Design a protein with these regions (language model features):
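Catalytic cores of nucleotide-sugar-dependent glycosyltransferases that transfer UDP/GDP/TDP-activated
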Residues: 1-315
């Protein structure tokens, strides 16, 4: 393995959301291509992911294709979430991206530079994380504006379903849960439910339906779909556990629910991988009301733990 680093660009508090993201990821994309002759290795295929490395197929086609070793390289570009496209002002085309004005049309879309659009144009194959999502992003509702670009290139668009690591997410060996179980010993799942109820201060009852929700608290995840029905739901003989963080309005809403329905509702406003797996194991039902979901892993994890997903018809 070869790892590309630059402390000026990447020794930061987080991976994304920096003021100079355009420069950081342009550097990384160009460094990927500059590395190849240094290590004397020209791959058959380069796989770029999302807007952060979208410039790899663009640079390959516009600046490297004619150089020795680069001519036969093919590129695959994967879209995990089309909402995040890498949009920037046109005035940084040369100064930051190092692309000539004569080549601006590759990136230009809807009055700005759109890195994802450039990758869709230049890549040999474009993939998404499910067959359904590959169809959905041809629709204006799901494409965040890129549907005409994708419609013109349907011939190279593929949907490949995401997967989970079944060794990490395995109730038979998971060290994070109270009692391990398998298909043959699935009755032991009730002990994980009782342990989760005890951990969160809910009444321990193996028979009350326990609903779990592990998610980022963002509009995409359909949180606002729950608000109109929460009172009605909480009048039923159920318990509910929410784990996640995100938009303040949704965090505050679930904090309110924890207060208003404290005998049967718990909100843990953070992310904790061990607690997430305890919820997958301890819940009876897993709620996933996403308005848009490219593929979704949580429902796969829930099923791995024998917890029934309640989902929206997307992704």
């Amino acid at each position: 393995y070869y790892l590309i680093d630059n402390e000026q660009y990447f020794k930061r508090g987080g991976t994304y959301g920096e003021y100079d993201d355009a420069e950081r990821f342009a550097y990384f994309s160009k460094a990927v291509l500059e590395l190849l002759p240094q290590i004397d290795f020209f791959p058959d295929i380069i796989h770029a992911n999302d807007w952060h490395t979208a410039l790899v197929p663009v640079y390959l086609d516009t600046q490297y294709r004619s150089l020795p070793g680069y001519g036969s390289i093919k590129t695959v570009f994967s879209i995990h979430n089309i909402e995040f496209q890498g949009k920037y002002d046109r005035n940084i085309l040369e100064s930051v991206f190092g692309i000539y004005p004569s080549q601006e049309s590759i990136l230009e879309f809807d009055g700005c530079l759109n890195l994802m659009k450039g990758a869709i144009e230049c890549a040999n194959i474009v993939t998404t994380v499910s067959e359904t999502y590959a169809k959905e992003i041809l629709n204006p509702y799901f494409s965040f504006g890129l549907h005409p670009i994708l419609e013109a290139r349907q011939y190279k668009l593929r949907g490949i379903v995401n997967g989970i690591d079944t060794e990490v997410f395995d109730p038979e060996t998971d060290p994070n849960i109270k009692t391990n179980y398998s298909l043959k010993t699935r009755g032991n799942k009730r002990f994980d439910k009782l342990a989760l109820q005890e951990e969160l201060g809910l009444t321990q009852d193996p028979d009350v339906p326990l609903i779990g929700l592990v998610t980022r608290l963002t509009p995409q995840k359909g949180i606002d779909l729950l608000e109109p029905v929460m009172d009605e739901l909480m009048r039923e003989n159920v318990q509910m556990v929410v784990l996640g963080s995100g938009y303040a309005e949704y965090e505050n809403y679930f904090k309110y629910c924890d207060y208003a329905y404290h005998d049967k509702f718990r909100a843990v406003i953070k992310f904790s991988a061990p607690l997430a797996q305890q919820i997958y194991a301890g819940a009876d039902l897993f709620l996933m009301p996403s308005k848009s979901e490219p593929c979704g892993l949580a429902q796969m994890i829930a099923m791995r733990y024998g917890t029934i997903p309640i989902v929206h018809t997307v992704g």
